[in-house]
């Protein structure tokens, strides 16, 4: 490692592995006019077609890209309502093969009826009962009724974990909650006990009022920021600088946490009144504390990334965050160690054939696209 930088590897606080085969897929039958239509015409249309092989290919190719980007741990939020049974174990085994740590969940909701809702609860209980680590996943307040919300919190308590849910990503979530329950999204989640669980993850948190911010600020739960996805979906920019526990995620847009950290840094001037490079780097690193809270495999000190970075200016411990925010990218990732095992060696995945993974992903993408 002479002349190289060695740092802890990266973790993704919120991913959607199931979207990996969406790159370049056929357009929606109608151009979405708002966030709800993005869900209805794009993602909900796609996730209903996923089967075991598509899910496996999605996990393998996501694992490949994570590893090559220096990401050795993934917190994922999965959806495949008509191929639900065993889906979490399929993802777990694929990520294990690549060598990544993970905390998985299935995003249970009421959008596909009672039978699918019950299957989501059963899948979650079975996965967590098997000894795997993860969360109890929910889609969002506007697709989760009171029965499901209460049972999800009970299930999380049973397994000593948290609830992983999208929160006020679009303003529609708040409008539905006010109309249906007479309260804000975060107040509803707080009343149900979600915010009492230290391992709960609230994704996005874009449209919050002052009371909701106070509820989150005084709770032990986590918030995850997904800047690029929020920009892509035109839902707005969240403000996160007053929350004590904030992680960074990609929301399935990609698997590059260097890029996510830089995006959060560059957008902070608009959303948060500015942020220092050190603060952006610390936000990137916050995920490690969440992982350690689960005692999950892959959260230890034997997870490292070796960076090949030739700087034209002096590089010191003090100015490292500035170099990171302005100059680093995934091309600097040379080798990666995950749980003490070399999984990327000089830019190539170790122990698996990259070409085979990509060919499998292409095959499954064609199958998926033919169904859309």
Where are these regions (language model features)?
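Histidine-rich, glycine-flanked metal-binding segment
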Residues: 1-7
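Alpha-helical scaffold segments that flank or form the walls of functional sites
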Residues: 6, 25-78, 82-100, 122-129, ...
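Histidine-centered catalytic micro-motifs
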Residues: 8-20, 162-171
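Active-site gating loops and adjacent loop-to-helix segments of metal-dependent hydrolytic enzymes
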Residues: 21-55, 113, 167, 171-197, ...
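Metal-coordinating catalytic core of metallo-dependent amide/deamination hydrolases
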Residues: 83-206
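His/Asp/Glu-enriched, well-ordered alpha-helical/loop segment
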Residues: 191-197, 239-309, 327-328
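A conserved active-site cap/scaffold subdomain adjacent to cofactor or substrate pockets
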Residues: 203, 207-244, 249
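Active-site microenvironment of metallo-dependent hydrolases
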Residues: 281-372
